[in-house]
């Protein structure tokens, strides 16, 4: 079959204008039971999203099959050609740009119009509409894979109503024995994962990612803690009325939990203003905890309260805890006035303390005399020991002195932590009278060690001659 009659009289002239050599179309045998094979000329095939070749796409030999692309991708690629520095259509048939083969040898449209590296980058980073396909999860995976680290995702909690659940995910990894953890929440598991990954990326690179379409449906509550900092996360919310409807999760419950963990008074809510027409009311509610105060506005009291709690929760996450100020604030909260030594300890005058009897006084005096006259080697060595040296095993030394002087040592861990979040411990010496010393530390073991150190200081003072 003559090529001019098959493709039309204008095809060779069009191919010549594009510097593309015409190809001889080989007829294909008709197969029974299959639709007739379609033949496209190069220009029509290019416009319809088919491979650019004189050979048929479907059923072609393996060496002559071509990549079939969507119209959107072809349009995006053709648009790139019009930019300065890009490959022009007049260069399509250049063998140097097409790998020395022009349109022959089974080279698809992507390989002809774009160099192979640019084609791979285009396909991997864009979709059919030319939009970025990278999500926070994929970006985090790419960042950590360079260091041979794979982040792990864990479903922590599902909260909210059955028809509107809120999923909370934790993403974590270890780098040189340093744990990194981030929390994220969303209306779907996918959204929660992306929120957690976004929070971790924000911390790692110190920059905010652009909002993705999946997270635009509502702000995602995310939080990040590094090496057990104890933070529960942060959230994105605005102070407007409608925007507050998109607040994810239960900020009122989170704030209540935070106050319980820190042993603070519970938050109090108070309606400040109520303005607007009856059908368009705008409420303002204040949330107060100790000396902190945050406001929330919304079209209903519920929305305003949630926003106020959310802002307070966010503020407390970012505010360092000052144990001294917190203690003064709590005392002022409980007593209704700022703490002062006279007011705070004034009630001690009214407390009835049992009177020291002569018999009990003699026992205490006898105990002190016995301690001072003790001749144990460990107890005598204690007088010459500097107890500020951290290399000393205080618990072991106290046990040796107790064995030598025949009294028992009992450690009592206190469940309640200090205002600064430290563990507490009491050590009891079964002497007469009973000696009790207190200790605190970042861990329960450190608290016991500190209590033993204070007990040794007590014995050192009582046995000084």
Curated annotation (Swiss-Prot):
InterPro entries: dsRBD_dom (IPR014720), RLC_Component (IPR051247)
Residues covered by region (Necessary and sufficient for enhancing processing of pre-miRNAs by Dcr-1): 220-465
GO molecular function per UniProt: double-stranded RNA binding; RISC complex binding; siRNA binding
Biological-process GO terms, alphabetical: central nervous system development; dosage compensation by hyperactivation of X chromosome; female germ-line stem cell asymmetric division; germ-line stem cell population maintenance; miRNA metabolic process; pre-miRNA processing; regulation of regulatory ncRNA processing; RISC complex assembly
A Pfam family: dsrm
Gene it is expressed from: loqs
Protein name as it appears in the record: Protein Loquacious
Region (Necessary for promoting preferential binding of Dcr-2 to the less stably base paired ends of siRNAs): 129-322
Segments of this protein annotated with the region Not required for interaction with Dcr-1: 1-379
